[in-house]
Amino acid sequence: GYKVYWADGAQLPPQHAAAIADELTRIDIFTGVRSMDYEQALAEGRIELLGEDCDRRFMANVMGMVNDYETVKKVADDFGLVYTPFHGCGYKLVPEALTALGIKHLIPVPEQMVIDGNFPTVVSPNPENPEGFYLAIDLAKKNDVDFILGTDPDSDRVGIMVRNHEGEFQPVTGNQTGVLLLDYLIGAMKRSGKMPANPVALKTIVTTEMARKVAESNGVKCFDTFTGFKFMAEKKNALEESGEGKVIFSYEESYGYMLGDYVRDKDAVTASMLLTEMAAWYDAQGMTLFDALNALYEKYGWYAEKTHNLVMPGLDGLRDMAKLMKDLRENPPTEISGVKVIVRKDYTDGSVIDCVTGAKSRMELSGSNVLRYELEDGTVILVRPSGTEPKIKVYILTQGADAAAASLRRLRYFMMVRTMPRKPHSPRRTVLSSPEWEPPHSIPM
């Protein structure tokens, strides 16, 4: 397939996509269609190639997002990072942006700086998968740097790895990276005088609630959207056209970040530049991003998230997915892993049910096949079918009094989620329980 963008530069929102699909049903697409030699079409101006001029305009906007050249300059002699584009198109503009920022010690992974759609050095070029960073980790250890940056092949998503207190590199999740960047941007924009009136942050409904805590604790409103940047772009347009707010940052847990007014989609070039500026700023404070993340947990609370995929392959997969969602609606759980469900939300029709009082209400968001369960201990469980693969995605958003408590609670719900049936059943199921288990002796961050 392919992506279609509207005049504002964003992917088509559902209403426009539906209108185009409806129009396609009204025409015979072969009527009047002519073929033409590519070179002839190019010569006649029927094909327009985007060239260096487009890159220059884009990069001018990217560098206009810089908040703190001075701090980068102060640490530039000692601060360094490793970068990999995973054989993709980030190999050109990401290093250009970081060099323009003032980074002197940018260490690329040479084997992965070559565009190659076979991705010969990795099993998967997805920055969500830490296994792909093995070459970058070796390079970072040899060069004694604490920060690794990796962009996916089409350079719209970015993942980072940071050195922990044991000297090893660990991945920072999309949820955590977004929280780090949001908190940094709020401070940096205030320090540089760039903070607009009525600032707003956007996140998806399946992204950590820690983002809301960070935003609202610093005077920034936070709104939820459905998964996908077409919805974030639509919300950004609506808020700014109405004068209700100015969006300073939008992100989702799957490593996508939207910044500025010149892009209405996730953009790894701008995100990479600002993540590097952030890492340099913390370096000037004597902190790594691992230190910074722990400081944010100490300040805002210990949050923990986990996503689990219930894969339903084969010819029956789509049917089983639909049946499971239907079963959850008709026989909603009253408890999950021994904890009471206090609020149920169905984003299909926007309905909200208070399970304690029985009161019913409506929320603003509706029109997406997602179920949300809010539990007595503050945990949120969301369930939705994937739009592209034969699987049900289950999101666990929880928190605890400290790192161990948050991780333990996440593990408890994760074990329950793993036991959810791939095959829906008809008997009434009011309790979702995890099997008997023993807490681990140590809980990783």
Model-inferred region functions:
Residues 141, 145-147, 168-170, 188-384, ...:
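Phosphate-binding and adjacent anionic-ligand microenvironments
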Residues 2-132, 138-140:
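Gly/Ser/Thr-enriched, mixed-charge loops and adjacent short helices
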Residues 1-28, 125-150, 179-185, 197-211, ...:
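Phosphate/diphosphate-binding loops
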Residues 62-66, 74-98, 102-104, 133, ...:
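Long hydrophobic segments that form regular secondary structure
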Residues 380-382, 432-445:
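Metallocofactor- and cofactor-centric catalytic cores in central/energy metabolism, strongly enriched
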